[in-house]
Amino acid sequence: MAQKGVLWNGKYYTIPQAASKIDSSALAKSPLGGANVLAVLGEMIGLIPPQTAMQVGNPSLALSLINPISEEARLASQLVFQPSPGTDTPGASQVFFLPVNPATPATLDLGTMVLASYMFGLPASQLKVKVETGTTGKKISVAFQDNSESFDNLEKDSFSILYTGTGSAATMTIDVTLANHKLTTAITGAADALNLDLNTYNTIQALVDAINATGKYTASVVTGSPNDSTMLLDAVVTQDIKTASFTAGSDLQAAVDGINSLSAYFSAARKVDAGAAPANINWTYATGGSNGATTNDDWQAAFDVLKTMQVDLILLISDDPSIHSMGDAHCTFMSGPTGKSERRQFVGGALQNWNNPASRAASIVSLKAAAANLNSDLTMHAGLGCYQYDPNGKPKLYPAYITAAMYAGIAAGSSPVMPLTRKTLRCLGLETNLQVTETSDLIDSGIAPPFPDTVQGAGYVVSRQVTTWNQDSDLYHIEFSVGRGADYLAAQVRKRHEQIAGQPGTEGMDATIVNLTNGVLQDALTAGYIRSYDPKQTQLRVDGTIRYVDYSAAPILPINWIFSTYHLLPTTATIQL
């Protein structure tokens, strides 16, 4: 039969009438996402495992995680959170630290259990351990430099058992090896022997119930945790259970659990087939802690970790140009159609020689070559090193990647469109005070050096936020905040569009796509991320299963130059006497 009605809004109409629906998609609020997650990559030892990104929210926690031997990493960790003096320019608040060097922990074999330090690197080998008889059970003490910890009463009773049958003698054996894992008894003069598989009776309560079910034994749960695993019992060999009740324990597991739950320095693991608490030993040092020798493969592994994360900014604690190029390649991939996670990086090179005119000229050439080698709008090169206080409170000159840490901190504490130009840096001085011609030359070449703040007459600021891009004069590529702001807005629109993928391609859904796009633009306008936009310019074109959306907005550009002209007016006067 021919269809005589129409389908609209999910309902089929045959009777002429008016109908209505509400489209509120233009009013939908989907707040703009964050854009200030910073990842810091470099050689560092301490409590962060290698090739593991750990989120840190404040500078104090960063200091507690990074060992003092990693001086530059610790300094960078402070500068990203506090890159500028005063409160006008806040620092980062979401920072991931990712050690690239293959550092190893220190370990200590206690015979039946192995301790592994939480600390990675050579200092971990300064940890020492003592095992002795405690008030009850074992006492394990740990010392590191001037700090120590002790854990007493490491023992655990699990269940008691007494043979009550007619046999003249009875013994019990608990075999904890992986091959057997059984509780067995040997009875003289009666057929009351037990042969219980601990894989079957895998809790203390289940084991006690199975023993009591024979009617030939009296067993009781002693532990406060009846669901404790029987696989963690201590070994027992031909123990008399006829003349007196015997209490089986889990003392080894008590020692393991005690270390794992209480120690700030070690984790513990029982060894395969071990079945007794560790023997007493005098103070013994752990061994094997190493800082590791970092290779480019280690750096690549760290960048691969970042591929699984949503980060926006990257700081590389390295002066190696090959590492800078690897980081830029990572940013390029992740900012592309496959990565779909836009990000940019900050780098700095080694200290240069500025002692004489020839050396200065060579240093300028070297910095210009570094920018030319990168030639990327995703990398900002700080150029010059800076003076900071060292751990002893004395001024020390550090490489340019420490200056880059301040750049990264300022960016991570600001909106995506905030220019870094003329932002004040927290430093005592610079590697050199560039001449005006040198500064201009470096900026033209794609280096963003700091220079003295001539406006305030003190301190140091970012000269101009140029990237290392040298291919054209497009501000999207040249000015860090312009490119970052545009990338941010495009990512926010894309994320809203992702919500529509898989929906039916109705005209109403097409209107929703347009409304969502304009909603993001309006939110960006309200937040000051764009200067203006025209919602009527947002266009959608349908091609089968494809939706092409075109939209436009005026980006926020930095104010780089203000040229003023003072027009002098002639003085005229009429004097009457």
What are these regions (language model features)?
Residues 28-29:
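Short acidic low-complexity segments
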Residues 2-18, 22, 32-120, 124-178, ...:
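A glycine- and small-residue-enriched flexible loop/hinge signal that marks low-structured segments
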Residues 535-541:
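Serine/threonine-rich, repeat-prone extracellular segments and beta-strand-based repeat modules
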